[in-house]
Curated annotation (Swiss-Prot):
Protein name: Suppressor of tumorigenicity 14 protein homolog
Family: Belongs to the peptidase S1 family.
Superkingdom of origin: Eukaryota
EC number: 3.4.21.109
Amino acid sequence: MKSERARRGAGGSGDLGAGFKYTSRPENMNGCEEGVEFLPANNSSKVEKGGPRRWVVLMAVLAAFLALSLLAGLLAWHFQDRNVRVQKIFNGYLSVRNENFLDAYENSNSTEFANLAKKVKEALKFLYSGIPVLGPYHKTSTVTAFSEGSVIAYYWSEFDIPKHLVKEAEQAMAEKRMVTVPPRARSMSSFVMTSVVAFPSDPRIIQNTQDNSCSFALHAQGSEPIRFSTPGFPDSPYPSHARCQWTLRGDADSVLSLTFRSFDVATCDERGSDLVTVYDTLSPVEPRAVVQLCGTYPPSYNLTFLSSQNVLLITLVTSTERRHPGFEAVFFQLPRMSSCGGYLRAAQGTFNSPYYPGHYPPNINCTWHIEVPDNKNVKVRFKAFFLQEPNVPVGSCTKDYVEINGEKYCGERPQFVASSRNNKITVHFHSDQSYTDTGFLAEFLSFDARDPCPGSFMCNTGRCIRKELRCDGWADCTDYSDELDCKCNATYQFTCRDKFCKPLFWVCDSVKDCEDGSDEEGCSCPPNTFKCGNGKCLPQSQQCDRKDDCGDGSDEAKCQDGKAVPCTEHTHRCLNGLCVDKSNPQCDGNEDCTDGSDEKDCDCGRRSFTRQSRVVGGENSDQGEWPWQVSLHAQGHGHLCGASLISPSWMISAAHCFVDDRGFRYSEHSVWTAFLGLHDQSKRNAPGVQERGLQRIIKHPFFNDFTFDYDIALLQLDRPVEYSATIRPICLPAADYTFPTGKAIWVTGWGHTQEAGQGAMILQKGEIRVINQTTCEHLLPQQITPRMICVGYLSGGVDACQGDSGGPLSSPEEDGRMFQAGVVSWGEGCAQRNKPGVYTRLPVFRDWIKAQIGV
């Protein structure tokens, strides 16, 4: 039904909608009507002479007509635009103070629910009627749920608002948030309604609310976990173009713990991703969202979330037809915390955010008062710190934060230390009503302020490191303070322009080791020459001449991309015998070979999970993150070596793993067992793990067990494996594939986490970089052959170690596909400075692999 204003605007003599009026009466001029009369001319010649004046009149009339037409068009557009209506939906909740919560309120089909919902809707209608930009345009309100406190009503209200009033309406609704309803409004109902909260909502969130086919209500029973999942999980995909929701409840004075055990929905992209949102309320209001999820997560990813009260709402809004199984989750209730924080009196100790490493609950405040002995000072070291929120600028700690000594800390931070000037310190933790993270893990220590780091160097962050690490060219302090104000030793160090010291042999090695790049300045070759990747200078005529004049192949890389050329050792040979001179054309998404063979057999190197965990104080990998990684167990010895899966029946490993030693026949295939899809060595019987024996071991015939040259072996499984989310092959690089200096590559394995340490239970990962071959030969003289590649950090810290042998070097390419760059072979110690790891260079053996097994 049209409003009074709209009806008036429809009349011929009423309001036109903006205060303009029209009348058909002629205007009076001294009591006479104004008119225009045209008289015939008596003299045609006079008429001809008057022609120009006539044209002026005609042009004036035409101009006036055009102006009036334009004005009329503008007015029509203006009034039409003002009459355009926009659907606006506000979602929120309110408190009903003089009602007690009844169990029947959990059932939206109960009479009690309907009666109370009717009262709430009447009260909302009366509230809106007092707001001029809302009342006339209110269409309907719907109550979706009730919960304790005394009674909290969750609702959404729909409005049909003129386009030009939308901003004003949103502002009016914003001003009504968290308000107490006036007494007159309360008197219109039989209950007291307070604290009305409402926010604009995405209409997709409200769609199909009357359709309960994908709406579920669950109530926790005791402390027993309750399982639920998307419809059809895991055998069929969840519905497309739908809205599903799960209402989770617990008993009064409890909170809920929610964990997604399996999560696989459409990949996050800009096409309107399928989205799972968890709310710390029963109304889908964005400011109360705890987390939003899309994509796929490995089972080991931390997806545990806590509520601040006894309810949670989960929504799944789908807009695609991509086939994904959805999620499986469990929840249970636990007692609400009576307090958070407390007094810690000791010389040292630990504390953490609530429910760490799970996500801390929203809307919480914790304060720890720490006190150490009187004659000491206290420092707090944060070993893990994750307090991130979406769309919050870095350094802007306005939402979740930790406050110490008046300074706030937030976001994701490396290990850092905060200290006091006496024996007491106070740590305050705050989370707001939305978006939580995993929080922090911290320890406090007492120290003597006169000597805070006995026998060590103290970083500006308060961390203590060994004195010999000062001014050694590597930043051991996270704030680089150990490398500030240094005087470099010119005998073996280079002084960067920013005054940092670097090893002299790093100069002109094609890798920028100084932050300002000064170690690579002045290294250019003379005019008309080509600079190789290893720093060597060649005449330009030797570039792209089909010969490896540099020694590292860089002079033959990226030559005549994609064009057929004569075949050499540095070109890519297609199956039809033709060659293309393009760097790494294999499986790059572009057909460079005329027969398309460079894009065949590319079902490899892909991971099923799109999300990986953040590393906290270690290098634990996620389940399924490296699906080609294999654990090799020798009879009676447990895990000894790694391997990589390259086909359903074949693996690659290191030849030195199969050399007989101390009376044990490691060369016998029958003593070995391969575990594929394994993540945790203590869970070899876990679902998804496949166990196989070996049928054959093929060591390279030129393998030298003294120099470790040709350190590669092929292993045939006794029966093929079945590919799954956690078992996939890695891509093998062609013989011409190059891995340039400085490229980031990943090493994985269950080897020792430190030299002389113990093997890891969880699969470890470490990012390392390809090291210049000339530099490597300088560091390990007379030990490096063309079949070897040096990878690591000359600063040490990350490397393969005992037990990692035979495992893969996984090199990520631009499209996310992984190629195996090498095989873990040998090294001097583990992760030592200036002692990079040495790996078997895999492209060198590509033809041998194909000749042996046809892969």
